[in-house]
UniProtKB/Swiss-Prot annotation:
Keywords: ATP-binding, Coenzyme A biosynthesis, Cytoplasm, Kinase, Nucleotide-binding, Potassium, Transferase
Physiological role: Catalyzes the phosphorylation of pantothenate (Pan), the first step in CoA biosynthesis.
Binding site for ATP: D7, I8, G9, N10, T11, R12, L13, K14, T126
Entry's cofactor comment: A monovalent cation. Ammonium or potassium.
EC number of the protein: 2.7.1.33
Family as reported in the entry's similarity comment: Belongs to the type III pantothenate kinase family.
Cofactor names: NH4(+); K(+)
GO terms, molecular function: ATP binding; pantothenate kinase activity
Amino acids binding substrate: Y95, G102, I103, D104, R105, T177
Organism in which the protein naturally occurs: Acinetobacter baylyi (strain ATCC 33305 / BD413 / ADP1)
Positions annotated as active site in the UniProt record: D104
GO cellular component, one term: cytoplasm
InterPro entries associated with the record: ATPase_NBD (IPR043129), Type_III_PanK (IPR004619)
Protein name according to UniProt: Type III pantothenate kinase
Length: 243
């Protein structure tokens, strides 16, 4: 069976086509605040793939999600749009109001939750998201601006100092303003993760574009990089869909 999986984030649209659980096609594109237009341009391609089911993860608002549903109806196949539940597939949400938890974070936790397993899941995307899960209990988490959002905020609010792009590649004290900014921002996020990991023994799972960068500085915790963690969570969600 061929299935289409969509991950519609704040800035990118990613899709996977799988056949018998094997990924046979994968792509990711910036949607420039118009994900429905980007999806519309892909529909003809999807129509020729003999896809039999589509699973969707979308962080968009209700209006945009309605447009996404409308476009996907052109495929004339069953569609499942994932949402956060108080409890689903044995996993219990740690938020007081589950609807406030991002679907991307929920699916990432769903992908790693197992009995007798404590996991810290770090999403290294537009924001740095941190979620803790013990067995099948989601314990809540943290959201921080990512490396680039912090740098941009500093540039916008610091008069007289120009901070050009540079690499986030070192935790040593900077010997010029550019390095001091980049090393300082990276140190702040790495230190946050280290503090959380020191509070209780747990497995560290990293996902998202900057996962390899953070893994480089978190080697004592033996980080596991999972590029397609959301896909695994979405597949798990669809397998255990509610009637």
């Amino acid at each position: 069976m061929k299935q289409l999986w969509l991950d519609i984030g704040n800035t990118r649209l990613k899709y996977w086509i799988t056949q018998n659980e094997t990924v046979i096609e994968h792509a990711a594109e910036l949607h420039l605040q118009s994900p429905s237009d980007l999806l519309l341009g892909l529909i003809q391609h999807f129509n020729h793939q003999n896809i039999q089911k589509v699973g969707v993860s979308s962080v968009l608002d209700q209006h945009n999600n309605d447009r996404i549903r409308s476009i996907l109806k052109r495929l004339h196949i069953p569609m499942i749009m994932a949402k956060v539940h108080q409890e689903y597939a044995a996993l219990r949400c740690g938020y007081d109001h589950p609807e406030q938890l991002g679907i991307d974070r929920w699916l990432q936790v769903l992908a790693v939750a197992q009995p007798d397993r404590n996991v810290c899941v770090i999403g290294c995307g537009t924001a740095l998201t941190i979620d803790l899960v013990k067995g099948y209990q989601h314990l809540g988490g943290y959201i921080l601006p990512n490396l680039y959002l912090q740098r941009d905020a500093l540039i916008q609010n610091t008069k007289g100092i120009k901070i050009p792009d540079s690499a986030f590649d070192d935790l040593e004290p900077g010997h010029n303003t550019i390095d001091a900014v980049h090393h300082g921002i990276l140190l702040g996020l790495v230190s946050t993760i280290q503090t959380i990991m020191q509070q209780s023994p747990q497995q560290l799972v990293l996902t998202g574009g900057d996962a390899p960068l953070f893994a480089k500085f978190l080697q004592p915790y033996h980080p596991q990089i999972e590029p397609d963690l959301l896909l695994k969570g979405l597949q798990h969600y669809v397998r255990h869909q509610l009637p």
